[in-house]
Amino acid sequence: MNNLSRRSFVSFTLASTSLLAMPAISTGSVRPKVVVVGGGAGGATAARYIAKDSKGAIDVTLIEASKHYYTCFYSNLYLGGFRDYDSIGHSYDNLSANHGVNVVHDWAISVDSSAREVRLGSGATVSYDRLVLSPGIDIKYDSIDGYSVEAQTKMPHAWKSGTQVKVLRDQVLNMPKGGTFAMVPPPNPYRCPPGPYERISMVAHILKEKNPTAKIVVIDPKNKFSKQGLFMAGWEKHYPGMIEWLDPDTHGGCLLYTSPSPRD
């Protein structure tokens, strides 16, 4: 299979939308419309390059509820104190000002493929000729009994960047001396398999400097994890005695329940 480059993808998109909207284009009155749902790395990049490489021939609208996007990549560097918070945040102003993308800050509620419309949380609709869906992931709060949107402010999952990573950093820095940091990584499959263990490593880095008698307990529902040998060798070398990884055979299985009290 031949690789599809960004430029050939945009050329294909331009050609296909032109065919779809041929009567409008032939009169010179209406540009074909591409709507992108989701302003993360994937959606924002798609919106930018469709607008840029079409040289304005395509009317591009990006629908994203948040006014700032905080990257998961580099968030560990913020967590460990190697970058400041603002450095992982990005606004959408550049897309509008430099690339002519229409940015709509609202929730996309539903898609009517027959009418070619996206319905927004406000009740308005946005029409399209071609639709790009890049909503990213979200947390299934009800998958853990007792967990909720409200609970995440006290027991951060930090699986999404931004405020969640900020809460996590503040809590780690304010742990009592000799306290215990506990993590329950998710079962497979999930996005970025090494992610929880990268977080553990950075938390250990903070504690080694700020709270060296603290302990980290990893209660894992898996018998093994991504890059396990490398992580455990690194933990033993840099944080000896601080991190305890428990597999199901050791801890007997995870009871998926959280107490309203964040430290019970």
Q: What is each of the regions a protein language model found here?
A:
Residues 234-248:
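A glycine-rich helix N-cap at a beta->alpha junction
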